[in-house]
């Protein structure tokens, strides 16, 4: 590991710059020291194609061997090797690999990484169960009126031929993922040398955070500048349920906006002493985004405001998914593939309003308010704040 590191006065004293990169975070590398003196290397892994979220940040620390957390997008393995070389570390030296969740910008180069390093592969127990399936195809789309309408709108509005190349890359990623084997399934409270694991589902069912002293590697659970996309509620297709690994999973506790907000509460409860190290936007717009748990509180507030807006729109007579989505998002965020992301985000919020008893959803998918003095979603969020 390099001895001569440049200290820049604008950064906290426990953070040293190893490599100065671009304003958008590309090519940066840092050494971050925890409260106990443990060093964590943070390196930006550039994607092959442009990404709105920027590079994926991979973290490396030494405790009974070198551990790596998250890798990057498919086809970016050469970029990863180059980024690691800036720290003086070779992929071959890595003893343990942890993936914070099974999205392609985090586990996209796992097959190549394992082949070259021989590292022990660790991930949440639901990652093992679901890695053989496309995350968009496991849902029973007839499970609720909202899911039925979401599926219909997707077929009507999205031309798969336009995104043919993207779908082919997507399929290749899942096929490659099937070839990997997880050596250790992690659960809430699992420990590995130097770190503790927290299960924080909601953005993804297998999302975990990794605590190293006062440093929390959050994956996509908590991000600066952008709010992670929550999952909608899940009911597995019947054929998926019959998989021995999947049938042990609880869809109720791994998916949905309510689950995500509860997981944010878990991070908030860690207290003001910790610092969050995200998988995206650690460095962006020429500045370091080193956040505390207040960022998790900000994201909870974001969703509370979105629930408030939807509740108000329904009260004013907007009663279907299309109208509510166009009321919530500007037109530029409803173009192309962004449309499904916006629709599914609205579905996640409507499901929570339905679950807590604030709205009724007919079999046709129309929505009406239940007449209450105080909406129940307010109590739901306040209770999480109190517990935190």
Task: Label each region the model flagged.
Residues 1-16, 305-388:
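C-terminal regulatory/interaction regions
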Residues 4-10, 54, 76-78, 85-190, ...:
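Active-site HxH/HxHxD metal-binding segment of metal-dependent hydrolases
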Residues 14, 25, 31-36, 58, ...:
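A structural signal for the main folded, soluble domain(s) of proteins
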Residues 28-91, 210-225:
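Conserved beta-strand hairpin/beta-sheet module of binuclear metal-dependent hydrolase folds
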Residues 37-46, 166-172, 193-195:
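Short Pro/Gly-enriched beta-strand edge/turn motifs at strand-loop
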Residues 61, 70, 80, 101, ...:
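Divalent metal-coordination and catalytic microenvironments
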Residues 75, 196-297, 301, 307:
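Metallo-beta-lactamase
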Residues 108, 255, 341:
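Residue-level signal for the nucleotide or nucleotide-sugar donor/cofactor binding architecture
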